[in-house]
Structure formats: structure tokens, C-alpha cells
A protein has these predicted regions:
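Helix N-cap/capping motif at the beta->alpha junctions
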Residues: 33-42, 64
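Receiver (REC) domain active-site loop signature in two-component systems and cognate sites
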Residues: 59
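Active-site beta3 strand of CheY-like receiver
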Residues: 48-54
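Active-site residues of response regulator receiver
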Residues: 56, 86
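Short amphipathic alpha-helix used as the core "switch/output" element in two-component signaling
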Residues: 42, 65-78
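As written
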Residues: 64, 98-104
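Charged docking surfaces used in two-component/phosphorelay signaling
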Residues: 18-26
């Protein structure tokens, strides 16, 4: 049995949220999801402190990099491992996200979902059970 951990996944795609929730839960995680940045801010400002925060970049309300900037300014999750999971491969966006202390930047199209989970856990230095 691996370490117990919490994950908050933020994406505007409900299908992907559901799929990734199931995959992380199979690895023993407690998972919460937020459909878009506004919902994520409500959860984080309400006291959610996930071990791992996974953010999409391309979202209709506030993009993931802007969301991350707000999260950092408000010091909402200073101890969470933040990982971008997106199809955005624009180098400027990647560099801006890195400037806010992300631990990883995963391009969705380059991994199958189970590999995404493995990569996230590897980045977060957590053991898969």
C-alpha cells in the first residue's frame, strides 16, 4: 500500500475529470475535481489543501497559468505539488507557469491516461502502491 494523498484536478472537460479521478482513486488517492478555475478558487479559498494540484492551462474562464498566479499571490496552497496537465505547448506559457513554481508540465497528447497518473506520481515523489 502506497502513501495516502489528496489530489485536486482542475479542468473544464468533465469527461477528462471523471476519467482522471477514477485513475487516481485506483492508486489510493482521495480526489476532488473542479470544473474550471472559478470553482477551483472557491474550493481553495474554502480551505482545500491538496497534496497535488493538477491544472489545465486552456480553460474558458481563467486560464490555468492565471489561476496559478492568483493561487500563489493569495498563498492558497504553499505546500501542494503543482503540475500543469494540458495540451498547451506554447513555450511562453510553459515558462510563465514555471516561474510560479510548478513541479511538472505534462502535455496530455504525449501520454495515455495511466501514464499521466504514473508521471504525476513520479513528479510528486509519491509511491504507486
Amino acid at each position: 500500500m502506497g502513501k495516502q494523498y489528496t489530489v485536486l484536478i482542475v479542468d473544464d472537460d468533465k469527461f477528462l475529470l471523471d476519467m482522471y479521478r477514477k485513475k487516481f482513486e485506483r492508486e489510493g488517492a482521495t480526489v476532488d475535481v473542479a470544473v474550471g478555475s472559478a470553482e477551483a478558487l472557491v474550493k481553495l479559498r474554502g480551505g482545500a489543501k491538496p497534496d497535488i494540484l493538477i491544472l489545465d492551462v486552456i480553460m474558458p474562464d481563467i486560464d490555468g497559468v492565471e489561476l496559478l498566479e492568483t493561487i500563489r499571490k493569495e498563498k492558497l496552497v504553499p505546500n501542494s505539488v503543482v503540475i500543469m496537465l494540458t495540451n498547451e505547448s506554447n513555450q511562453d506559457k510553459i515558462e510563465k507557469a514555471k516561474s510560479f513554481g510548478i513541479k511538472g508540465y505534462i502535455v496530455k497528447a504525449t501520454y495515455i491516461p495511466s501514464e499521466v497518473v504514473e508521471e504525476v506520481l513520479k513528479i510528486a515523489n509519491l509511491e504507486i502502491k
